[in-house]
């Protein structure tokens, strides 16, 4: 493997706390005490991960009458009772099976209880149990706790299992550099990666966004004999697409001998991510021709981005024939499709027929009515349905108020956003308010919103809204201030210069018009 300048993190965690974990477990103190007492020496023996155990059968039988989680809880409670009575629990198969069940159910609290039941010598001497414990913590978002267990595994170099789990845990948390550091540490420790290592580390690489690192890992996986493994190559396609090299992504895609639905969806998503709709539609057609059904995520992405209404209608028909019209993400995308084409009746019909709705559904239908007051009616329905709006919801309703001149409603909603829903205003919300006041001719209020009420430095969208309002209402003084800030923030945006020229033209200030035009010439902008 090749080396890379990614500093391995220093892992020293004296305690488990909210500052050191991505999630705070209920058994904080138990974990802390457990780690202090659990390990005394090293020396592990391997245990087959697939060794049969009676515990799954026990849980399966109990699941007939109770949920799996209740059955798991019952088994652990029985074992805890036995331990309290001094009955020795030494069967590794039981603990391995319980950890497997906790992992499959993502039952981290139950996993902590199992962790407490494992005898210290068994945890020290059984690589299989330690590895499963690492996987459980890592998969549930406790990568740092998993790393503590991992650091005490003396023979962890005998298998990539625990390494893979920890790499995956960091990658899922967005700690991509930590995941990459572990991968390169594997090479230093002489641990041979397997087909499960590469998809995990490629995900981390895609998060970092480095094609150079990705190419190095590509060479590694070919050297290790996985150059034609569809599972690995699918991850490679995603990595190159996320790192910005869609050509390499397509080259890898074309190399896959037996493409599965993940291969096709990965390439389709990659094209959509890069805005290459024509290429995405070609992949979509090829998928259908090859008998591969695009998943609902891919279908939703295509529907939301398709430019031709004819193509959109054809896709809608295709969706109906496959009975997918009322899949939540697909229905949401159809609302966007029809509303963008001005087909509000069809968009409303789909929304009204939906069996379930999420925030995206409400946002889509509210945004569809951004030019009329009906959007506020949907917002009120959303409130009555106890659906929780988000920042996007308020961008839509505030834009609606600006477009329709509903100043008081806009002010009320802006206040409601933070006071009732706890959503802190962001740049786009302030831009909406400036637009609201500006369109209504309330220039002083618009300017005051920027210089007195904003808790952050105004960006181009905010100053741009103010400059446009100055153009609409012929306010030269504030317009000059807004233009000057925009010239500093966006020195190459000729639209800002053109708006100032129009403001001066309205005011019949010919000399200032020529001065701004000369500024454009000096900066190499078109006039």
Swiss-Prot record:
Major location category of this protein: plastid
Region described as Disordered: spans on this chain: 12-44
InterPro entries xref list: E_motif (IPR046848), Pentatricopeptide_rpt (IPR002885), PPR_At4g14850-like_plant (IPR046960), PROP1-like_PPR_dom (IPR033443), TPR-like_helical_dom_sf (IPR011990)
Localisation per UniProt entry: Plastid, Chloroplast
An example Gene Ontology molecular-function term: mRNA binding
Keywords recorded for this protein, A-Z: Chloroplast, Plastid, Repeat, Transit peptide
One Pfam entry name: PPR_2
Biased composition, class Basic residues, residue ranges: 21-35
A GO cellular-component term linked to this record: chloroplast
Domain of life where this protein originates: Eukaryota
Keyword Cell inner membrane set for record: no
Transmembrane segment boundaries: none
PROSITE patterns cross-referenced by the UniProt entry: PPR (PS51375)
Region entry Type E motif, spans: 462-527
One GO term (biological process): RNA splicing
Transit peptide feature range: 1-47
PPR repeat segments: 126-156, 159-193, 194-228, 229-259, 260-294, 295-326, 327-361, 367-389, 390-425, 426-457
Family that this chain belongs to: Belongs to the PPR family. PCMP-E subfamily.
Name of the featured protein: Pentatricopeptide repeat-containing protein At4g25270, chloroplastic
Organism of provenance: Arabidopsis thaliana
Upper taxonomic lineage: Eukaryota, Viridiplantae, Streptophyta, Embryophyta, Tracheophyta
């Amino acid at each position: 493997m090749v080396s890379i300048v990614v500093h391995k993190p220093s892992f020293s965690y004296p305690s488990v706390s909210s500052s050191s974990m991505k999630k705070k477990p209920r058994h904080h103190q138990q974990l802390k005490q457990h780690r202090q007492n659990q390990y005394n020496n090293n020396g592990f023996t391997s245990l087959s991960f697939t060794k049969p155990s009676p515990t799954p059968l026990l849980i399966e039988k109990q699941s007939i009458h109770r949920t799996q989680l209740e059955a798991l809880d019952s088994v652990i409670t029985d074992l805890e009772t036995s331990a309290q009575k001094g009955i020795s629990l030494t069967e590794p198969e039981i603990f391995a099976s319980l950890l497997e069940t906790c992992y499959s159910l993502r039952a981290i609290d139950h996993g902590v209880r199992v962790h407490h039941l494992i005898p210290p010598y068994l945890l020290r001497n059984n690589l299989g149990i330690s590895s499963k414990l690492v996987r459980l913590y890592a998969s549930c978002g406790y990568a740092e706790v998993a790393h503590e267990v991992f650091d005490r595994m003396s023979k962890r170099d005998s298998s990539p299992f625990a390494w893979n789990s920890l790499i995956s845990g960091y990658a899922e948390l967005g700690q991509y550099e930590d995941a990459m550091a572990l991968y390169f540490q594997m090479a230093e420790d002489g641990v041979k990666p397997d087909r499960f290592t590469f998809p995990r580390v490629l995900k981390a690489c895609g998060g970092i966004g480095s094609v150079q690192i990705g190419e190095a890992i590509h060479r590694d996986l070919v050297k290790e004999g996985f150059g034609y493994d569809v599972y690995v190559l699918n991850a490679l396609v995603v990595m190159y697409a996320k790192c910005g090299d869609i050509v390499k992504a397509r080259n890898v895609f074309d190399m896959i001998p037996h493409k599965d639905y993940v291969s096709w969806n990965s390439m389709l998503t990659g094209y959509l991510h890069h805005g290459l709709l024509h290429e995405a539609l070609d992949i979509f057609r090829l998928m259908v021709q090859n008998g591969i059904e695009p998943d609902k995520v891919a279908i939703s992405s295509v529907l939301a981005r398709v430019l031709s209404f004819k193509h959109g209608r054809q896709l809608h028909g295709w969706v109906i024939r496959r009975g997918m019209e009322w899949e939540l993400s697909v229905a949401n995308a159809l609302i966007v499709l029809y509303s963008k084409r001005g087909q509000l009746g069809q968009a409303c019909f789909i929304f009204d027929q939906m069996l379930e709705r999420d925030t995206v559904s409400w946002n889509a239908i509210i945004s569809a009515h951004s030019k009329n007051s009906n959007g506020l009616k949907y917002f009120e329905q959303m409130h009555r349905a106890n659906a929780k709006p988000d920042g996007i919801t308020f961008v839509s309703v505030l834009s609606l108020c600006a477009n329709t001149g509903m100043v008081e409603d806009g002010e009320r909603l802006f206040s409601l956003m933070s006071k009732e829903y706890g959503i802190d205003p962001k740049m786009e919300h302030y831009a909406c308010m400036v637009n609201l006041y500006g369109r209504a001719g309330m220039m002083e209020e618009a300017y005051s919103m920027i210089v007195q009420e904003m808790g952050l430095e105004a960006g181009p969208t905010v100053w741009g809204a103010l400059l446009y309002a100055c153009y609409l209402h012929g306010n030269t003084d504030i317009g000059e201030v807004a233009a000057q800030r925009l010239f500093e923030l966006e020195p190459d945006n000729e639209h800002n210069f053109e708006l100032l020229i129009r403001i001066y033209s309205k005011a019949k200030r010919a000399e200032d018009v020529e001065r701004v035009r000369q500024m454009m010439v000096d900066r190499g902008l078109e006039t």
